[in-house]
């Protein structure tokens, strides 16, 4: 699916807020451009955040307008697109535009959604639920494979640890790798504090650097990073998104470490 010698970077804003998403996508392309030989960038954003903490929180522009926006970004920037889906009907529509359709962590056991996602023959990114052990991902994988589609990505995004907290167990990455599919680490949702702000999730972005480096050292194929020009003003996941400025600052170290780990793995074979 992807060149193994390149680090996957699935990056973009949490949700499509307005036309500013185009400028964010352009800026991301500029940031990644110097690393074209080392990084495979995929743009991500959501047309609907269907599991917001409060009914009053912004969800997005909706399926029709959202997919139109993503299609324009795909055409203008010549970039692959990922978005998340929440029902079989959404999966069918999203696959007409997006190269990768994502099954959200909360929905990673929904059989009809996984099967329909597989039937589209798009690449399917399955995010491991916060409530699942890595071994239990065999079930979701088998549901997609049952359709004849073996284009699967597995994403680790932390596991629930008591109330309003997530932890990242790097052993999970090794377990997921053994399934034989590319493994990605979600460096921004992993620092969420779910429901900590009552009507929305909190976050500890100061831990993004150490967790992303740890995940790369553990052998992930890439990173999933939600990013925004000004996270504090974002309409969703404001407390856990990484600023574009910080992404640009961290990217060189990610690439350098990924390359080093690739070289070490080659020597140890």
From Swiss-Prot:
The EC code for this enzyme is 2.5.1.55
Which residue positions does the secretion signal occupy? none
This one is known as 2-dehydro-3-deoxyphosphooctonate aldolase
Q: What reaction gets catalysed by this protein?
A: D-arabinose 5-phosphate + phosphoenolpyruvate + H2O = 3-deoxy-alpha-D-manno-2-octulosonate-8-phosphate + phosphate
Q: Where does this protein chiefly localize?
A: cytoplasm
Gene name of this polypeptide: kdsA
Q: Please name the GO terms of the biological process aspect recorded for this protein, alphabetically.
A: keto-3-deoxy-D-manno-octulosonic acid biosynthetic process
Localization, per the record, is:
Cytoplasm
